[in-house]
């Protein structure tokens, strides 16, 4: 699929649930959110149909997200069924890692290519502050499980927040020296009710990037198909370090993705409230209708995101859209 700005759209992020076993401060407001009812969430067979039509239109890569995708029953079988779609080249997942010790082997066997694990602190107390309920040791065991079964490359997603974890970047870089881990520092993005805290949390990664690169002696590396990340590594290290600067230096000109929410809405841009209902008027998912909705969303994809423009923030929280 080619949008009106000449960008090739071949990547679909699929949220399968808005529920999560953590309550991260940048993903959900303190009071929590009202979760979608079971009947409003797309059934797995509906997700498969949407992906099948998407691949006919040019989708080659799917990332399974949440909420936390591993809290939804049957996710391993979903991966297995998606792997049967011949045009689908890559199936990945973003997870907080807590349940990976239980599911990593089965996910790998089902056909999952690799995982991104959200880990925002290497300090157990700070980790609990950020997640509001998580145990740091469980996340670490999840990373170990992913490495052991070969869900490679294992990427660590770290949202950098001012005054919370911005003093830990060097420690994260050190993770990549002896382990085949690929840390990606991500700028905080204001979403939904959590956007009220954006003035407290947001910090441009440009303030840290050059300092860390110089201090750690990192050199640039070119990793194919690594999305918006600008990548570096410490010479001799097993892993790499990436910087994703969605706010300070956006990558909209090369954006290749759309997002499918757990309740069946296709969003052409994360930082926009524009979305297309993939269900027909009768509430069903049809191949013809899905094709039309993809084409409609393609036309609605903006030239760039709207973060901070005229004080705009997306109305939905990240957990409701899909992380």
Swiss-Prot record:
Name listed for the protein in its UniProt record: GTP 3',8-cyclase
UniProt: GTP binding residues: 13, 63, 94, 155, 257-259
SUPFAM superfamilies xrefs: Radical SAM enzymes
Keywords: 4Fe-4S, GTP-binding, Iron, Iron-sulfur, Lyase, Metal-binding, Molybdenum cofactor biosynthesis, Nucleotide-binding, S-adenosyl-L-methionine
PROSITE patterns with a match to the protein in the record: MOAA_NIFB_PQQE, RADICAL_SAM
PANTHER family xref list: MOLYBDENUM COFACTOR BIOSYNTHESIS PROTEIN 1, MOLYBDOPTERIN COFACTOR SYNTHESIS PROTEIN A
Assembly notes: Monomer and homodimer.
Binding site for [4Fe-4S] cluster 2: 252, 255, 269
One of the protein's GO biological processes: Mo-molybdopterin cofactor biosynthetic process
Domain Radical SAM core, chain residue ranges per copy: 4-228
A Pfam cross-reference name: Radical_SAM
Transmembrane spans: none
Pathway assigned in UniProt: Cofactor biosynthesis; molybdopterin biosynthesis
Binding positions (S-adenosyl-L-methionine): 26, 67, 118, 189
Cofactor info, note text: Binds 2 [4Fe-4S] clusters. Binds 1 [4Fe-4S] cluster coordinated with 3 cysteines and an exchangeable S-adenosyl-L-methionine and 1 [4Fe-4S] cluster coordinated with 3 cysteines and the GTP-derived substrate.
UniProt family annotation: Belongs to the radical SAM superfamily. MoaA family.
Residues annotated to bind [4Fe-4S] cluster 1: 20, 24, 27
Its EC number(s): 4.1.99.22
């Amino acid at each position: 699929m080619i949008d009106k700005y000449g960008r090739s759209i071949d990547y679909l992020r699929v949220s399968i649930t808005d529920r999560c076993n953590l309550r991260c401060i940048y993903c959900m407001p303190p009071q929590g959110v009202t979760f979608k009812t079971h009947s409003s969430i797309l059934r797995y067979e509906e997700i498969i149909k949407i992906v099948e039509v998407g691949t006919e239109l040019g989708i080659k890569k799917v990332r399974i997200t949440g909420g936390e995708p591993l809290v939804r029953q049957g996710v391993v079988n979903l991966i297995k069924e998606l792997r049967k779609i011949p045009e689908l080249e890559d199936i990945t997942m973003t997870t907080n890692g807590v349940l990976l010790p239980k599911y990593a082997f089965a996910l790998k066997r089902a056909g999952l290519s690799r995982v991104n694990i959200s880990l925002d602190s290497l300090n157990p107390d700070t980790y609990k502050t950020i997640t509001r309920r998580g145990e740091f040791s469980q996340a670490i065991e999840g990373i170990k499980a992913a490495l052991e079964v070969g869900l490679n490359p294992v990427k660590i997603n770290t949202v950098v927040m001012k005054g919370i974890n911005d003093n830990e970047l060097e420690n994260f870089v050190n993770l990549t020296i002896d382990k085949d881990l690929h840390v990606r520092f991500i700028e905080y993005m204001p979403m939904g009710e959590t956007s009220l805290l954006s003035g407290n949390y947001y910090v441009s990664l440009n303030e840290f990037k050059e300092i860390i690169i110089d201090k750690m002696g990192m050199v640039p590396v070119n990793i194919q198909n690594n999305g918006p990340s600008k990548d570096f590594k410490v010479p001799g290290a097993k892993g790499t370090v990436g910087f994703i600067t969605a706010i300070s230096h956006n990558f909209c000109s090369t954006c290749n993705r759309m997002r499918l929410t757990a309740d069946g809405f296709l969003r052409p841009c994360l930082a926009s409230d524009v979305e297309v209902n993939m269900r027909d008027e009768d509430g069903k998912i049809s191949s013809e209708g899905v094709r039309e909705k993809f084409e409609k969303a393609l036309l609605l994809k903006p030239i760039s995101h709207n973060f901070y423009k005229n004080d705009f923030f997306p109305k939905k929280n990240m957990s409701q859209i899909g992380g």
